[in-house]
């Protein structure tokens, strides 16, 4: 199998893009292991489940993050959780790639202003898949916590 991917997308922040998440995850699963495939599940619970249950989710998700080779985030629908996951991944030197539909939203300056993140704006879903191929097909991922793969359509290249 290829890379271990942590896919991040809005859950409690809104499920308007859940079908898109499902398609992206299915595409990546052809040659990779998506640790968070449940994010594409249309039937995920959107309600808080209590501190104990949420603590279990936190522990599982952060373990998956630390195990992952790369984080792929779809950020068209704003999400506090996805923002937290991105910051956590940066802290652990996990390469992060952020996709968003620029016809529907703008990213926070906290993301676009941080050169750690590879930003991939798109207008049509079909634009996502060649970029994923480039990201996931690259040989090297980490050098001092930085992405070494070629970046496409980035807002903040290093």
Where are these regions (language model features)?
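Conserved catalytic or regulatory cores that recognize and/or transform ribose-phosphate-containing ligands
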Residues: 1-158
């Amino acid at each position: 199998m290829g890379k271990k991917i942590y896919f991040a997308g809005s859950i409690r922040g809104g499920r308007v893009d859940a079908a898109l998440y499902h398609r992206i995850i299915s595409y990546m699963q052809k040659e990779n292991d998506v640790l968070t495939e449940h994010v594409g599940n249309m039937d995920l619970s959107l309600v808080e489940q209590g501190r104990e249950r949420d603590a279990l989710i936190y522990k599982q998700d952060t373990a998956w993050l630390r195990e992952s080779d790369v984080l792929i985030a779809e950020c068209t629908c704003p999400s506090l959780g996805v923002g937290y996951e991105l910051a956590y991944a940066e802290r652990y030197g996990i390469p992060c790639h952020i996709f968003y539909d620029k016809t529907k939203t703008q990213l926070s300056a906290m993301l676009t202003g941080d050169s750690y993140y590879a930003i991939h704006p798109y207008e049509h879903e079909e634009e996502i898949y060649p970029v994923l191929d480039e990201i996931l097909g690259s040989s090297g991922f980490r050098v001092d916590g930085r992405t070494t793969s070629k970046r496409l359509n980035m807002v903040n290249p290093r």
